[in-house]
């Protein structure tokens, strides 16, 4: 298990374009392997568990495709739930009343995006980076 506060390299900064394709990766969430993703919106990087708040399904309709056509909101391809890319909060659709996306802490430095594990989200192993699915 990685120590809390230990930064783990996720991807080069250039891999995340504003409103573009996200980077998928896997984490241990509460001890179980789970999908996650990172995106860039408004010049900042954000990451979330890849799990709709409405029904526990992955959001992307094609691998890494998380934004709706205007690239303003994240969308669940299954039921159309809409989420704020900067907060993960439900902004409409099927997620209303079900909460939002579970955030994962990221940090950007030296042209890299780093993941900051916490008590619930850990890397799959201490020896392997959280590579894209």
Task: Identify the residue ranges that each predicted region occupies.
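Short cysteine clusters
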Residues: 52, 76-79
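N-terminal pre-ligand scaffold of iron-sulfur
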Residues: 1-69, 84-85, 100-133
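Short cysteine/histidine-rich metal-coordination sites, predominantly Zn2+-binding motifs
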Residues: 66-74, 90-99
């Amino acid at each position: 298990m990685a120590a809390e506060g230990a930064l783990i390299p996720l991807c080069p900064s250039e891999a995340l374009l504003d409103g573009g394709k996200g980077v998928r990766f896997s984490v241990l969430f509460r001890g179980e392997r789970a999908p996650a993703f990172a995106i860039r919106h408004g010049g900042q990087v954000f990451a979330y568990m890849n799990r709709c708040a409405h029904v526990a399904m992955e959001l992307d309709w094609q691998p890494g495709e998380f934004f709706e056509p205007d690239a303003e909101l994240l969308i669940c391809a299954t039921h159309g739930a809409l989420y704020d890319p900067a907060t993960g909060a439900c902004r409409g659709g099927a997620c209303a009343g079900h909460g939002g996306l579970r955030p994962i802490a990221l940090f950007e430095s030296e042209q890299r995006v780093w993941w900051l594990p916490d008590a619930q989200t850990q890397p799959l192993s201490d020896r392997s980076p959280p590579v894209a699915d």
